[in-house]
């Protein structure tokens, strides 16, 4: 494969500096990093170019101090309208100056003379930006829009690891881990109740699984709404909502009538009746139509860990309702308990 096809080769960088000599130095350094470079000597010329060609600019590097212009102008125009990552460079880097630019949207602040090592890794800002876009859109497909170049995320994934330089490989690894973590977080644990996309709270399978895990971790006697909420760590989920769910959960447990199944486990009679009425195993909802149904079981290797066991999700669904494993003191073993709201 031609090395010119590998990312971050061809990263499109626009550089702004009123010092023509240093502007030439920056251009040479960026070209050595295999980036495509466009240079301007002042902000007023650069901004119209960006406004007319936002799709061909991946990153802006701007000098902070101009004789007649404020470097913040480029930040305000570029970051607010197009979200193009902007890096500021300056000869001095006192705390107040750095904070001023970072607070106004700068992705990084480089001290002159800028080292080529810093420029060779400058692509990370574009990578993180597109990773954040991916997280906001909740799907990678939204990043590939007609009329726009392939996303940095897609190009980075398409670059074979064996053809990357050692430096690129080392710096890309933690970022790829962040992407994988985001994917697991999105498809796995719920971290913000607004991610469910509902106007009213819906106790989905995953949310209920986190609730049960918290209850089992605390133990039934110590499971109170405030502590459950602290363990679940779901933004915008209120203590009142957890308290209501906990009350319904405990009421259902009290209403369960022990019945011995063919496997010797303890089941509720209502659960057995529903099993006979609904022999097929597919996705169901409760009577209110607001809960997803799924089976849960404790990992076989963790049965000895009591109430602190975490729940393991099975890849099938049940019409019986939520299945929760409870400790049977008479049998000295765990048995499933089904419950619905």
Swiss-Prot record:
Residues 195-254 form the HTH myb-type domain. One of its GO terms (molecular function) is DNA binding. It comes from the Eukaryota. Keywords: Activator, DNA-binding, Flowering, Nucleus, Phosphoprotein, Transcription, Transcription regulation, Two-component regulatory system. Two-component system major event consists of a His-to-Asp phosphorelay between a sensor histidine kinase (HK) and a response regulator (RR). In plants, the His-to-Asp phosphorelay involves an additional intermediate named Histidine-containing phosphotransfer protein (HPt). This multistep phosphorelay consists of a His-Asp-His-Asp sequential transfer of a phosphate group between first a His and an Asp of the HK protein, followed by the transfer to a conserved His of the HPt protein and finally the transfer to an Asp in the receiver domain of the RR protein. InterPro entries: ARR-like, CheY-like_superfamily, Homeodomain-like_sf, Myb_dom, Myb_dom_plants, Response_reg_B-typ_pln, SANT/Myb, Sig_transdc_resp-reg_receiver. Its main location: nucleus. GO terms for cellular component: nucleus. Residues 225-250 bind DNA. It is found in: Nucleus. GO terms for biological process: cytokinin-activated signaling pathway; flower development; phosphorelay signal transduction system; positive regulation of short-day photoperiodism, flowering. The modification 4-aspartylphosphate is found at residue 63. Induction: Daily oscillation and diurnal expression in plants grown in short day (SD) but not in long day (LD) conditions. Residues 12-127 form the Response regulatory domain. Transcriptional activator that acts as a floral inducer to promote short-day (SD) flowering pathway. Activates Hd3a and other FT-like genes independently from Hd1. May also activate MADS-box transcription factors involved in flowering regulation. This is Two-component response regulator EHD1. It comes from Oryza sativa subsp. indica. The gene is EHD1.
